[in-house]
Each structure stands twice: as structure tokens, then as C-alpha cells.
């Protein structure tokens, strides 16, 4: 299993911010149509010494789905970067030991 994470900062280089409404609309239009499950987390972090809020989306997928999922999330990251004038958006892929308890 792999965990693929998309970490979206909410500060703009011009000093603006990505509002709750703006990021929720992005999630609704650009992320939710592509995935049947996944987790969103509100976070905080630093970018170039500046504090910023972040929105994190992560999904656990089978190894056979990891490449396609990572490619899709990289496309989503690029749309977020362009739409909200971000310097960069982080996509991380981590090997996990995960079990679904059903």
C-alpha cells in the first residue's frame, strides 16, 4: 500500500490568502470527482520562514493504483498552483503498512 499526499499551502506570494470558500470549491470541483475516498486535514506549516495554513488530502491505495493516483494528484497540484498563484505544491508518496478493517 502507498499513501499519496497533496499538501496545499494557502498563502499567495503577493500576500493574499486562499479562503476557506475558495479551497472548498477547489476540493469539490478538482478532487472529489476523481476519488471515492480520501482524507482532508487542516494543517499549519512554514514556507520560506512564513507561517501558513495548509489543506492536506491523502489517500491510501494499492501498489497497483499508486502510479495512476500519483499522476492524477500531480495534475491536481498543478491546477492548484496555477489557480492560486502558488510557488509550489507538495505531492508526497510514502510506502505504508495499511490494512482495511471491514
Regions picked out by a protein language model, each given a short descriptive name:
Residues 1-18:
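Terminal, regulation- and interaction-focused segments at domain boundaries
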Residues 53-102:
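Helix-rich interaction surfaces within compact, conserved domain-sized segments
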Amino acid at each position: 500500500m502507498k499513501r499519496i499526499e497533496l499538501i496545499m499551502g494557502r498563502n499567495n506570494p503577493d500576500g493574499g490568502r486562499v479562503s476557506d470558500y475558495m479551497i472548498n470549491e477547489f476540493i469539490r470541483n478538482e478532487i472529489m470527482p476523481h476519488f471515492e475516498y480520501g482524507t482532508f486535514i487542516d494543517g499549519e506549516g512554514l514556507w520560506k520562514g512564513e507561517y501558513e495554513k495548509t489543506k492536506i488530502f491523502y489517500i491510501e491505495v494499492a501498489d497497483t493504483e499508486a502510479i495512476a493516483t500519483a499522476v492524477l494528484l500531480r495534475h491536481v497540484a498543478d491546477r492548484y498552483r496555477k489557480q492560486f498563484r502558488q510557488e509550489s505544491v507538495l505531492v508526497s508518496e510514502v510506502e505504508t503498512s495499511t490494512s482495511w478493517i471491514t
